[in-house]
Amino acid sequence: MQLSKHFTLKEMIKSMTATRKGIDNTPGSGEIKSLGDLCYEILEPLRAHFDKPVTITSGYRSEALCEAIGSKKRSQHAKGQAVDLEIFGVPNIKTAYWLQNNVDFDQLIMEFYDKDDPAGGWVHISYHESGSNRKQVLTFDGKKYTEGLPDMEWKGGKVVG
């Protein structure tokens, strides 16, 4: 099922853990609508800006899958409102800054950020169509959350961390 021009339901629900453990990761109609909103409001503008495919590393998670991976059963992933993503060839911090400055979102987290590894970690972003998006921006280094994104470092006109 196509959710938007470049994103399918299949890629939004793909989970190696669900496959390995035989967990049903099928969303309901409300979650599918939320995933579509996420595609149109966040993912399509992101893909258009960088003109590169966006890799969804984690999208929708059923409550059973959330439990299996130690996540909250009612996380925004379980509501179809959040994805974890990367863009091959684009430092994750650069992706996070672009999202912060260009789309409406509820929560943006630079996950497992390591300034010495621009390709390390991933970007978590959530959206809900209710109009009450918090615009919360956090960085998680593997131990603690801090408000905001780390400063980007530039060298030769490119982001290095």
Regions flagged by a language model, labelled:
Residues K73-I93:
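Acidic, His- and aromatic-enriched active-site or binding-groove loops in soluble protein domains
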Residues M1-H49, G142-G161:
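Extracytoplasmic cell-surface/polysaccharide-interacting catalytic and binding patches
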Residues E44-G70:
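Extended, low-complexity, intrinsically disordered C-terminal regulatory tails
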Residues I87-G161:
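Catalytic cores and adjacent binding grooves of peptidoglycan-active enzymes
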Residues A68-A78, Y113-D116:
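Short, flexible, solvent-exposed loop/turn segments with mixed acidic/basic and small polar residues
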Residues L38-I42, L65, Q81, P91, ...:
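Amphipathic alpha-helical interface surfaces
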Residues H49, A78, P118-G120:
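A generic structural signal for short, non-catalytic loop/turn and secondary-structure boundary residues
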Residues T55-T57, A82-E86, H124-S126:
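Structural recognition of the beta-strand scaffold that forms the well-ordered cores
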